[in-house]
Design a protein with these regions (language model features):
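N-terminal beta-hairpin/loop module of FHA
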Residues: 1-6
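A basic, amphipathic helix-loop patch mediating RNA/tRNA/ribosome contacts
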Residues: 8-50
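Short, Lys/Arg- and Gly-enriched loop/turn segments at beta-strand edges
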Residues: 63-67
Length: 67
């Protein structure tokens, strides 16, 4: 799926909530902490990692292309 970034960046847990993978920001943080999220192909464990345009986030088989 594609996600159009409105600002300079978005926190990883907020992105997961915004696109509907996580029901809440807290659930998004758990997904990240459990190692279920990759950013540009690498497992990301920082819950509030700043996601910027051009990055690709994947979680539970869903891929998010940030533009």
């Amino acid at each position: 799926m594609k996600f159009e970034l409105k600002g300079e960046h978005i926190a990883l847990c907020d992105l997961l909530k915004t696109v509907g993978i996580a029901q809440t920001g807290g659930q998004g943080k758990v997904f990240v902490a459990d190692g279920n999220v990759t950013v540009d192909g690498a497992i990301e464990l920082r819950k509030t990692a700043k996601i910027r345009k051009g990055q690709v986030v994947a979680c539970f088989g869903e891929t998010i292309e940030v533009s």
